[in-house]
């Protein structure tokens, strides 16, 4: 994003000069910053990233099929004893790798989206209600927990997390305790 902004700013100072560039300068970078921020948010959103990859995947598949057809036609001509007048044909394996790389990216996006969704469901399941806020005393929140119940729920979640952490530490110590003995015997 910084590179995009740095590339866009020098033409403004050259075109605008002294006072005119100063009046136009602050408005344009803010718009570019907002555009850059939106692009960053889209990059982090797996669903948006997936949607952006679909046209690339279609193009890659079309290119792959075109190269496969060209290679097949060239091989057929060679098998029939005819010389190919087309010249060098693109490599099928490179376009296949490009296609698979895009498929892998899309798979990762879908897995990430699924993970985000399952975390959202788990969050709603384990903390389904909100605590009433002091900033909105007039608003009646029927599904909210009293603060004391919320505190007890959070304390139980922290206790559970500590138990899991301690169990993982014990397992790690057991594994580390066994590892030097096996290495020393080799």
UniProtKB/Swiss-Prot annotation:
Designated name of the protein:
Mediator of RNA polymerase II transcription subunit 29
Residue ranges of the region described as Disordered: 1-41
UniProt entry tagged with the keyword Nucleus: yes
Q: Which domain of life is it from?
A: Eukaryota
Predominant subcellular localization, coarse grouping: nucleus
> Mind naming one GO cellular-component term on file for this protein?
mediator complex
Q: Which Pfam families match?
A: Med29
Q: How does it assemble?
A: Component of the Mediator complex.
Q: Which GO terms describe its biological process?
A: regulation of transcription by RNA polymerase II
Q: Which GO terms describe its molecular function?
A: transcription coregulator activity
Q: Family, per the entry?
A: Belongs to the Mediator complex subunit 29 family.
- In the UniProt record, the signal sequence range is none
Function per UniProt: Component of the Mediator complex, a coactivator involved in the regulated transcription of nearly all RNA polymerase II-dependent genes. Mediator functions as a bridge to convey information from gene-specific regulatory proteins to the basal RNA polymerase II transcription machinery. Mediator is recruited to promoters by direct interactions with regulatory proteins and serves as a scaffold for the assembly of a functional preinitiation complex with RNA polymerase II and the general transcription factors.
Q: Bias category Polar residues: which stretches?
A: 1-12
| Localization (cell) | Nucleus
Keyword annotations of the record:
Activator, Nucleus, Transcription, Transcription regulation
Cite the record's Low complexity compositional bias ranges: 25-41
């Amino acid at each position: 994003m910084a590179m995009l902004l740095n590339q866009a700013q020098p033409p403004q100072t050259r075109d605008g000069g002294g006072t005119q560039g100063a009046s136009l300068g602050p408005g344009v970078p803010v718009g570019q910053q907002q555009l850059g921020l939106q692009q960053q948010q889209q990059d982090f959103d797996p669903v948006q990233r997936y949607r952006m990859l679909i046209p690339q995947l279609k193009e890659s598949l079309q290119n792959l099929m075109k190269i496969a057809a060209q290679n097949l036609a060239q091989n057929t001509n060679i098998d029939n004893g005819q010389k190919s007048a087309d010249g060098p044909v693109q490599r099928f394996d490179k376009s296949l790798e490009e296609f698979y790389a895009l498929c892998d990216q899309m798979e990762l996006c879908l897995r990430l989206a699924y993970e985000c969704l399952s975390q959202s469901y788990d969050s709603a399941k384990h903390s389904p209600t909100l605590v009433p806020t002091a900033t909105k005393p007039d608003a009646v929140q029927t599904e909210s927990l009293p603060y004391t119940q919320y505190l007890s729920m959070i304390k139980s979640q922290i206790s559970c997390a500590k138990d899991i952490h301690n169990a993982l530490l014990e397992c790690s110590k057991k594994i580390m305790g066994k590892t030097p003995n096996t290495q020393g015997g080799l």
